[in-house]
């Protein structure tokens, strides 16, 4: 997994959307719900196998989204110390994110990339990459971004997807970050990016954003929208067509 897009909307608002690409044989995830763990309120879809998650938000005013793999393709081993989805929950619950980065134990944890949005003070976009040996932490500009998992997509396909995303930006009005958005504008942006996650590509299911490689592909789409002080999570099961929206705050 997976494909992730980020759209800043101004006024510390944003939309982050994730397409989850996994083997079709993996246990189906539970739809997201709000729960309390270790005294912290979280909202996330629960992985059907390991009990972790690939995307979630917490009362710490933080969103974390997981992509399998670091900077480049790697060959997985049969066993690791901990599921990467549990790392997501651990960092969602920590009080101090920078301290959490330093303390999180990643020995014998498979490579991964985290896209993190934090608005505890001001809106921050952070990329955290574990390459299997070293932690890489990068503060990102508040611009539209797209990430594609290194375990599924090589550099040429990643570039193709960046090109598709650039075209999407040109075809859709991305308002100035200093301009307050009306509700209709935010909803329109979310509808449009969901359409991108459903339809972007070149008619090749092997590399299109809605991916299908026979034994695996896109199983769900999650879109988290922050509009003023309101936070919501949209979730869609690609196979059952079941959809749910949770108002988190």
Residue ranges of model-derived segments:
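N-terminal nucleophile
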Residues: 1-249
